[in-house]
């Protein structure tokens, strides 16, 4: 079993790196504001039609463009969900959503979280899924990538005030990266057996003679961007464990690759744009080390079996509870770590049914800020915050002004970095405390004791860090939970983007200083270790007390 697990992890990472390297070169061209071959004429036409200017923007203008697009998308999606019964492509005549569920869902998909307090096949029409959720899957992913484009330019430019044009970046990211790659993935899913139609739900007779209603819909097109954009919201309630979404072992492997593809490619692009590929490799090494350790821990925990089931006399040589027999323990463990290391949230197994230790690792990966590969764009700018913090700590230890890639890291940048890092832990801990203090929060818990608290902690961690996966056992479709999680998702997304853009605006105005003998190398194994230690230290200090009340207490009981 250990050899199989090692081979699975090694194969996954090898194929991932092979695919991400050329994509990273393409992204580097876009960051450097170089149109891809054959696209310049199309871009000029598309900008001329709505009269959009392609002038360079400072960080405030860039930020306002990103926020404006997302707020408009939030309003449109909210009213679309409220009135979906008036809209076309609703063969099941599904009613509109309640205001709190519509708000929660709109915020969820605009913030790239895709938390779902509903069952897709019984709640949303084809139009809502396709014109509402899928469109936001593209736009939220493009927004995250655009932010990291601007942040990377802050290190490659000097004595300037501009970071590019948000509309140009959003257009290029969507048209030349997300749409083509998602189209290829969708066609592959269709070839493998995923659904893509607009038929009414089909009544069929089962082998037992009973009648069953099979949901239909444009699944493959949404499934592709759901994975590629690290969105994670399933067309069906069972998400990627549903055979209509994820029909074969091959589609399952491709889904995992799609989740990590752009975050990995952005690391390669970062190294290429900065002129030092070692910087990109340093980030990949740090992410990969944490990732491999976490996968190993989850695999080990799940292979050991569930002692609670064993005490009841059930066969628990390995923990198959809540897992698809098509995929098994090892693949389910790998998928769980992939989807929570990235801010995806798609699932092929019930994380609530993992062992206490096996479920704690995905929760902790979210709590450290989704920086181990992370979401498209958001993962890299989240990890870059820890890079700046690690550089600052190293500067304090050696008595030098911290600098990274020739840019001095001053008090302003460190205040903004600390603010950005503290946003999501504050939301998680305060949100979980509020839920446990109120009757409305506790009434949604279906399980008592440490595991019940773990479900609450997981839900708030998932929302605040824009992941979207969940422990079951929490009845989250209530006004209290819909509003609480919507607030966490909104602030967890934009409360980090705003200081990140402010840091970029500060750094781009500075001159690059040449490296000297006293400059801390930020590309070697020493800095990789320092960066990993910084991530672990912040995560440990922040969440150990909360984890001790939940999964740790459950593991020791």
Curated annotation (Swiss-Prot):
The keyword Membrane applies. It comes from Shigella sonnei (strain Ss046). The chain crosses the membrane at residues 5-25, 63-83, 132-152, 170-190, 253-273, 283-303, 329-349, 356-376, 379-399, 416-436, 484-504, 526-546. GO terms for molecular function: P-type potassium transmembrane transporter activity; potassium ion binding. Keywords: Cell inner membrane, Cell membrane, Ion transport, Membrane, Potassium, Potassium transport, Transmembrane, Transmembrane helix, Transport. It is a multi-pass membrane protein. It comes from the Bacteria. This is Potassium-transporting ATPase potassium-binding subunit. The system is composed of three essential subunits: KdpA, KdpB and KdpC. Part of the high-affinity ATP-driven potassium transport (or Kdp) system, which catalyzes the hydrolysis of ATP coupled with the electrogenic transport of potassium into the cytoplasm. This subunit binds the periplasmic potassium ions and delivers the ions to the membrane domain of KdpB through an intramembrane tunnel. It is found in: Cell inner membrane. One of its GO terms (cellular component) is plasma membrane. InterPro entries: KdpA. Its main location: membrane. Belongs to the KdpA family. The keyword Oxidoreductase does not apply.
């Amino acid at each position: 079993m250990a050899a199989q697990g090692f081979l699975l992890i090694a194969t996954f990472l090898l194929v991932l790196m092979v695919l991400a390297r050329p994509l990273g070169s393409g992204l580097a061209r876009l960051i450097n504001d170089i149109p891809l071959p054959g696209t310049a004429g199309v871009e000029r036409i598309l900008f001329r039609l709505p009269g959009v200017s392609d002038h360079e923007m400072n960080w405030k203008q860039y930020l306002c463009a990103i926020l404006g697009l997302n707020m408009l998308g939030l309003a449109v999606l909210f009213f679309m969900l409220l009135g979906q019964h008036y809209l076309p492509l609703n063969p099941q005549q599904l009613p509109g959503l309640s205001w709190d569920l519509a708000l929660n869902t709109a915020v969820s998909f605009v913030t790239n979280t895709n938390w779902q307090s509903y069952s897709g096949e019984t709640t949303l029409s084809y139009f809502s899924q396709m014109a509402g959720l899928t469109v936001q899957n593209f736009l939220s992913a493009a927004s995250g990538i655009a932010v990291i484009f601007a942040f990377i330019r802050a290190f490659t430019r000097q004595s300037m005030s501009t970071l590019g044009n948000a509309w140009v970046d959003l257009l290029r990211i969507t048209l030349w990266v997300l749409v083509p790659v998602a189209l290829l993935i969708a066609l592959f899913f269709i070839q493998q057996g995923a659904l893509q139609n607009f038929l009414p739900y089909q009544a069929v007779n089962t082998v037992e003679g009973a009648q069953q209603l099979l949901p239909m819909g444009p699944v493959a097109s949404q499934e592709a961007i759901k994975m590629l954009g690290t969105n994670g919201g399933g067309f069906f309630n069972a998400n990627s464990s549903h055979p209509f979404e994820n029909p074969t072992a091959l589609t399952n492997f491709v889904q995992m690759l799609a989740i990590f593809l752009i975050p990995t490619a952005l690391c390669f692009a970062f190294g290429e744009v900065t002129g030092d590929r070692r910087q990109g490799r340093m980030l990949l090494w740090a992410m990969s080390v944490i990732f491999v350790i976490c996968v190993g821990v989850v695999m080990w925990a799940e292979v050991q079996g569930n002692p609670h089931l064993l005490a009841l006399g059930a066969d628990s040589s390995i923990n198959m509870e809540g897992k698809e027999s098509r995929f098994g323990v090892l693949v389910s463990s790998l998928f769980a770590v992939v989807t929570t290391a990235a801010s995806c949230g798609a699932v092929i197994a019930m994380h609530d049914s993992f062992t206490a230790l096996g479920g704690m690792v995905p929760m902790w990966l979210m709590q450290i800020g989704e920086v181990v590969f992370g979401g498209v764009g958001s993962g890299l700018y989240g990890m870059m915050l820890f890079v700046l913090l690690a550089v600052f700590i190293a500067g304090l230890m050696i008595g030098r002004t911290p600098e990274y890639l020739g840019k001095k890291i001053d008090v302003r940048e460190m205040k903004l970095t600390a603010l950005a890092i503290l946003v999501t832990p504050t939301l998680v801990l305060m949100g979980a405390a509020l839920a446990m203090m109120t009757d409305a929060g506790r009434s949604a818990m279906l399980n008592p004791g440490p595991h019940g608290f773990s479900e609450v902690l997981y839900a708030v961690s998932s929302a605040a860090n824009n992941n979207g996966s969940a422990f079951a056992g929490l009845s989250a479709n209530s006004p209290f939970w819909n509003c609480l999680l919507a607030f966490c998702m909104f602030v967890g997304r934009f409360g980090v983007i705003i200081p990140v853009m402010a840091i970029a605006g500060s750094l781009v105005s500075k001159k690059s200083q040449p490296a000297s003998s006293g400059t801390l190398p930020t590309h070697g194994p020493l800095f990789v270790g320092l960066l990993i230690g910084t991530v672990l230290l912040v995560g440990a200090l922040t969440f150990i007390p909360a984890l001790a009340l939940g999964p740790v207490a459950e593991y020791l009981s």
